[in-house]
Amino acid sequence: MWSGRSSFTSLVVGVFVVYVVHTCWVMYGIVYTRPCSGDANCIQPYLARRPKLQLSVYTTTRSHLGAENNIDLVLNVEDFDVESKFERTVNVSVPKKTRNNGTLYAYIFLHHAGVLPWHDGKQVHLVSPLTTYMVPKPEEINLLTGESDTQQIEAEKKPTSALDEPVSHWRPRLALNVMADNFVFDGSSLPADVHRYMKMIQLGKTVHYLPILFIDQLSNRVKDLMVINRSTTELPLTVSYDKVSLGRLRFWIHMQDAVYSLQQFGFSEKDADEVKGIFVDTNLYFLALTFFVAAFHLLFDFLAFKNDISFWKKKKSMIGMSTKAVLWRCFSTVVIFLFLLDEQTSLLVLVPAGVGAAIELWKVKKALKMTIFWRGLMPEFQFGTYSESERKTEEYDTQAMKYLSYLLYPLCVGGAVYSLLNIKYKSWYSWLINSFVNGVYAFGFLFMLPQLFVNYKLKSVAHLPWKAFTYKAFNTFIDDVFAFIITMPTSHRLACFRDDVVFLVYLYQRWLYPVDKRRVNEFGESYEEKATRAPHTD
């Protein structure tokens, strides 16, 4: 049995190593491009000729531009310098068609200075929608006074039935890039990702590619979107520019394609936005480090999950285990799942949280020795009996919870009342769930203390799932490293460090109460027997 479990763990680790190595090789193939080695079949950069360029941004309601009619010039950058970074905010007129739930497009032209873009044969251009369709976020109000952050005009208020309909939202950012590397491509092995952004021209006997213009769609975040009302006539648009290297450009193209594929598979704009958040404003080297850390986090999560399930599957007795702590973990994971559901969190986060909540419910069933009988559609619960040793553990557990309640309940009630008076919510249910989840994050570690108290009273830690604890501890320390780097709620950030304190106390108790390796555990095994047991021979 032991060798089988060990072999499975080795297999998982082996597959993980192969996956990491393969991913590194694929990433290397994306960011590295082999330059042209000879003179034949080489494609030279047009930017190397140092042309005088101009950047022009137009808006129109049409997705295909046939002529210069019905377009508005919103930004004109003369003497455009590819090497110079800039950011400018302009006011864009919103046409009536767009205000009536229509779409507005931006046309970005990079052309020779002093020449209109549609008269320049060497111009490059891209088109990007400045609007997107989304279901508007429910309005948050003060539940006691009924006041909201933005008081709507009565004429603009929509009926309740229309609140779930997608409406046009404004994208206030337009991020532009130009590939500034004077890279010489090999015409026989052009990367497919960059090729679709390239426009080639013949100058004498040499083929040149015009400046590669790119729109960074990953910078468009859901949190920045603005609802377009019928009374809106102008909206701000921040146009930013920065040069980009060939390696980063290829990587960004692949990432945008991946996000687009998610949307094609049915992911909503909000789900795709969760993925965008990983890449926006992130250094490539830090992004690579994040990938490796996330990969190890996933491995430790799986190993902790496997060992935790294995431990509880064989668990027949609750001697030395805090039932209150098990109940609390179940309650907290269910509350966090409902909170994520109320916040309309991405399925990438919601599904694992739901699986974790289901597992904690199963643990409660094991801890309470609960058997469920179905009489038609009505369930009937039957609870098992506890032994004398289990009742002693339960007595210590109840004693710890009694002392803990004197501190915990006033803090939770006070926090809930404070949030009700000062914070706006969508509904009473939203306030209730937020109050619970804030209590879980802020004071949840206190519910780990009954297990420490039981360990202290019994002078033993042999009953705890130490393998699962170890893997979870690795993940906790990984979370600490990124707690002040990755964007997350402050309460969740503090929760990362509070778990460290409790785990260090667990380690101290393990040192203080060493496990007797000669003692037979509840499964009829001892550590020394496992080590000295000879293989069976027929």
Curated annotation (Swiss-Prot):
One GO molecular-function entry = phospholipid scramblase activity
Glycoprotein among keywords: yes
Subcellular location field: Endoplasmic reticulum membrane
**What would be one Gene Ontology cellular-component term for the protein?**
membrane
* Record keywords, A-Z: Apoptosis, Endoplasmic reticulum, Glycoprotein, Lipid transport, Membrane, Transmembrane, Transmembrane helix, Transport
Sugar attachment sites are N91, N101, N229
Tissue specificity: Ubiquitously expressed.
Membrane topology, Cytoplasmic segments? 1-10, 306-324, 365-402, 450-538
> What Pfam families does this protein's entry cite?
CLPTM1 (PF05602)
Stretches assigned to the Extracellular side: 32-284, 343-346, 424-428
- Where is it predominantly found? endoplasmic reticulum
Question: Membrane-spanning regions, if any?
Answer: 11-31, 285-305, 325-342, 347-364, 403-423, 429-449
Q: Name one GO biological process term.
A: apoptotic process
- What membrane topology is given? Multi-pass membrane protein
Q: Which reaction does it catalyse?
A: a 6-(alpha-D-glucosaminyl)-1-(1,2-diacyl-sn-glycero-3-phospho)-1D-myo-inositol(in) = a 6-(alpha-D-glucosaminyl)-1-(1,2-diacyl-sn-glycero-3-phospho)-1D-myo-inositol(out); 6-(alpha-D-glucosaminyl)-(1-octadecanoyl,2-(9Z)-octadecenoyl-sn-glycero-3-phospho)-1D-myo-inositol(in) = 6-(alpha-D-glucosaminyl)-(1-octadecanoyl,2-(9Z)-octadecenoyl-sn-glycero-3-phospho)-1D-myo-inositol(out); a 1,2-diacyl-sn-glycero-3-phospho-(1D-myo-inositol)(in) = a 1,2-diacyl-sn-glycero-3-phospho-(1D-myo-inositol)(out); a 1,2-diacyl-sn-glycero-3-phosphocholine(in) = a 1,2-diacyl-sn-glycero-3-phosphocholine(out)
Stated induction or repression of this protein's expression = Up-regulated by cisplatin.
Which PANTHER family has this protein been placed in?
CLEFT LIP AND PALATE ASSOCIATED TRANSMEMBRANE PROTEIN-RELATED, LIPID SCRAMBLASE CLPTM1L
Q: What does this protein do?
A: Scramblase that mediates the translocation of glucosaminylphosphatidylinositol (alpha-D-GlcN-(1-6)-(1,2-diacyl-sn-glycero-3-phospho)-1D-myo-inositol, GlcN-PI) across the endoplasmic reticulum (ER) membrane, from the cytosolic leaflet to the luminal leaflet of the ER membrane, where it participates in the biosynthesis of glycosylphosphatidylinositol (GPI). GPI is a lipid glycoconjugate involved in post-translational modification of proteins.
Spell out the family assignment given in the record's similarity comment.
Belongs to the CLPTM1 family.
Name of the protein described by the UniProt record = Lipid scramblase CLPTM1L
Species: Homo sapiens (Human)
